């Protein structure tokens, strides 16, 4: 377990170390969207457990952790923002980098975890390296539009259903592009 002191929570996780003498290169695995446990378990499959096992057998130390408010981690998942999840990942990275068994430390982020990896790489406490697995390679608004269109198609809804709410979503995107996050959050709270 490690602390995110800025959030006042403890996050539970598993650190796997390779056999032999360290220090070892090390990674933090950061999950995609949705409340995920440290194995990123979905429908009985545990991709982060499999990835951690492979990396560890190949000489890389791996920290994987339960998202805040999920499984054994403290916090409230439902009210957390992308910045909160980035803060959790940064705390994990600091904890891992401080361990005597580790050398260069980085992030492997899956999907939304890839976005978090980009955020940390551009921040003040940048990891030594990042890997983005299925993280977006286009601007977030473009990604959201395409994701929404694909979800509508997969649900079997007609094109008219997609277009029906398109204007509202485009307006929301325009607002978030135009105004700083704190301004939008304050004004949304005033509507509640």
Regions found by a protein language model. Give the residues of each.
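N-terminal cap/lid segment of alpha/beta-hydrolase-fold proteins
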Residues: 1-22
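Conserved alpha/beta-hydrolase
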Residues: 50-72
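Residue in the alpha/beta-hydrolase core beta-strand immediately N-terminal to the catalytic nucleophile
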Residues: 106, 129-131
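Alpha/beta-hydrolase fold nucleophile elbow
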Residues: 100-111
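Accessory cap/linker subdomain of secreted extracellular hydrolases
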Residues: 133-192
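Alpha/beta-hydrolase active-site loop
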Residues: 79-99
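Short, surface-exposed "cap/lid" segments of acyl-processing enzymes
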Residues: 20-54
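Short glycine-enriched nucleophile-adjacent loop
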Residues: 114-125
């Amino acid at each position: 377990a490690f602390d995110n002191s800025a959030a006042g929570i403890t996050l539970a996780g598993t650190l796997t170390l390779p056999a032999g003498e360290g220090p070892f290169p090390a990674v933090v695995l950061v999950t995609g969207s949705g409340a995920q446990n440290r194995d990123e378990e979905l429908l009985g499959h545990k991709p982060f457990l499999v990835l951690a096992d492979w990396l560890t057998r190949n000489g890389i130390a791996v920290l994987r952790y339960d998202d805040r408010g999920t499984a054994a981690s403290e916090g409230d998942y439902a009210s957390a923002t992308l910045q909160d999840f980035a803060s959790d990942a940064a705390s994990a990275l600091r904890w891992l980098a401080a361990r005597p068994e580790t050398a260069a430390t980085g992030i492997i982020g899956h999907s939304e975890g890839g976005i978090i990896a980009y955020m940390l790489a551009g921040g003040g406490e940048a990891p030594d390296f990042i890997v983005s697995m299925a993280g977006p390679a286009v601007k977030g608004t473009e990604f959201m539009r395409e994701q929404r269109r694909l979800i509508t198609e997969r649900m079997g809804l007609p094109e008219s259903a997609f277009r029906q709410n398109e204007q509202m979503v485009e307006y929301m995107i325009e607002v978030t592009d135009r105004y700083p996050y704190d301004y939008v959050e304050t004004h949304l709270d005033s509507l509640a």
